């Protein structure tokens, strides 16, 4: 036990992970959670058919059982935050992105729509009523997709009853946060997607929403963000029927929780040495695994700051591996393509607690495991021994081994850029591009001068 006390504001993925790691370091940790349960977006934002509640509760239980203190129903304002700074050695802010982005739509008040976050919280808590009539969801990200699939269940659209659930997005499907499998599942659930549309104004009858007026878009040149510019098509306005409107266009941090004068200065730091940030509050809306990683990193930073030394080091262990290049991976593994995981039948999806994607089962697990590229094995060429015979180039996959004229290096000596050439006369090096290497070992076995070696790298963490 270090005797140090740390407050974690927010019991979502980042806060829970930070608390667990800080407890492992020997600190006294207290989580302050404004809701009546821990989990954050795990319980409020991600639908049960994607992430079952019993799994979440089991994982949270494993963390809290380590001796972490939890204060529920505690909203931290500036006065309470300042008190925490007096009582605790460090404070971690991991409250996520709780403020929904709102696009102004003429003629609509807050009574005429809900946000994706609001809807998903009500849906996951079981407090939402069955929707009647057409539902429009504005957005093209993860929240919009989850909201639409939740609406399909709430409105019983899955079974084909009257009315439609429609996602409306201002760009094209290619720019949405959705893959082909998700599109197929939404199609099964009778969810419509309409693209290249932007909302203009709401149509109100008897103080209730009856439709949304849209304008059609076309895409211009790419902007600095990488996405194409959105331009309106003249005289293309039209109205879609809608009894319910949900705005699911992302969310942002609520910085008002920070005391006056405190600003975020880095990924985990602020201009107050006692206050740290992590997860979505630090980086914006990402995914759960990034928030978990943030929790681990901020805990290590806090421990180092409080104790004065870095107590858990990471280093790479490099050792010679097989002298014949055998990694256990063969060229025919490239022909093993992904297969679809099993999903439950559409008629069983009305119950919002039924997990849809059942994952890989039986032989599928082994089949997918053999697709691993074994990136911990690294093949390298000793340029002192290489005679530029090109035999390795001839036997390996295309673009794996290249003729290089010169390299650019970082200050740490890492290759930053390789200048490839097709001419033998200009080639100063023969180089293995590890990003394209499939670890088949053929280059090592065919090399006449034994210039190629195979090493195994392992990330080692001190306990």
Feature-to-residue mapping (PLM):
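General beta-strand structural signal in soluble alpha/beta enzymes
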Residues: 33, 72, 93-95, 115, ...
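Surface-exposed acidic, glycine/proline-enriched linker/cap segments
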Residues: 116-134, 138, 217-238, 413-429
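N-terminal export/assembly segments and adjacent metallocofactor-ligating motifs
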Residues: 17-27, 52, 68-69, 74-75, ...
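Feature captures the FAD/FMN-dependent oxidoreductase FAD-binding
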Residues: 4-9, 14, 57-105, 201-213, ...
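Rossmann-like dinucleotide-binding cores of NAD(P)H-dependent redox enzymes
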Residues: 28-31, 35-66, 70-72, 121-123, ...
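Rossmann-like dinucleotide/flavin-binding elements
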Residues: 8-32, 71-83, 99-101, 118-180, ...
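Ferredoxin-type iron-sulfur electron-transfer modules and their immediate structural context
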Residues: 1-5, 91-109, 191, 204-209, ...
């Amino acid at each position: 036990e270090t005797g140090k006390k740390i407050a974690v504001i927010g019991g979502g993925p980042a806060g829970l992970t930070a608390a667990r790691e800080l407890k492992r370091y020997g600190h006294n940790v207290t989580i302050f959670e404004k809701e009546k349960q821990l989990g954050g977006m795990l319980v409020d934002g991600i639908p049960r058919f994607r992430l079952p509640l019993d799994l979440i509760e089991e994982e949270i239980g494993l963390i809290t059982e380590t001796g972490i203190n939890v204060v529920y129903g505690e909203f931290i304002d500036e006065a309470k935050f300042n008190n925490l700074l007096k009582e605790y050695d460090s404070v971690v802010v991991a409250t996520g992105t709780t403020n929904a982005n709102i696009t102004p739509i003429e003629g609509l008040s807050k009574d005429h729509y809900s946000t994706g976050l609001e809807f998903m919280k009500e849906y996951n808590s079981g407090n939402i009523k069955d929707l009647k009539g057409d539902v429009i969801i504005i957005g093209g990200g993860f929240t919009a997709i989850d909201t639409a699939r939740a609406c399909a269940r709430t409105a019983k659209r899955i079974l084909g009853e009257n009315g439609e659930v429609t996602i409306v997005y201002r760009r094209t499907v290619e720019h949405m946060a959705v893959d082909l499998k998700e599109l197929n599942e939404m199609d099964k659930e009778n969810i419509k997607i309409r693209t290249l549309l932007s909302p203009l104004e709401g149509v109100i009858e008897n103080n209730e929403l009856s439709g949304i007026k849209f304008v059609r878009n076309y895409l211009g040149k790419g902007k600095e963000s990488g996405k194409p510019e959105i331009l309106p098509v003249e005289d293309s306005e039209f109205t879609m029927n809608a009894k319910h409107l949900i705005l699911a266009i992302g969310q942002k941090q609520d910085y008002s929780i920070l005391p006056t004068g405190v600003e975020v200065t880095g990924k985990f730091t602020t201009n107050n040495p006692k206050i740290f940030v992590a997860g979505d509050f630090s980086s914006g809306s990402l995914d759960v695994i990034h928030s978990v990683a943030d929790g681990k990193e901020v805990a290590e930073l806090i421990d180092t700051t409080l104790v004065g030394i870095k107590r858990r080091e990471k280093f790479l262990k490099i050792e010679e591996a097989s002298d014949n290049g055998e990694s256990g991976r063969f060229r025919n593994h490239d022909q093993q393509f992904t297969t679809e995981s099993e999903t439950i039948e559409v008629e069983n999806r009305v119950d919002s607690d039924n997990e849809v994607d059942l994952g890989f089962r039986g032989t599928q697990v082994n089949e997918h495991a053999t697709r691993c590229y074994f990136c911990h094995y690294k093949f390298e060429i000793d340029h002192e021994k290489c005679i530029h015979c090109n035999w390795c180039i001839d036997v390996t996959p295309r673009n794996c081994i290249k003729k290089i004229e010169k390299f650019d290096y970082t200050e740490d000596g890492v290759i930053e850029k390789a200048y490839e050439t097709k001419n033998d006369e200009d080639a100063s090096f023969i180089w293995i591009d590890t990003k394209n290497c499939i670890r088949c070992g053929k280059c090592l076995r065919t090399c006449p001068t034994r210039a190629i070696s195979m090493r195994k790298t392992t990330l080692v963490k001190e306990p």
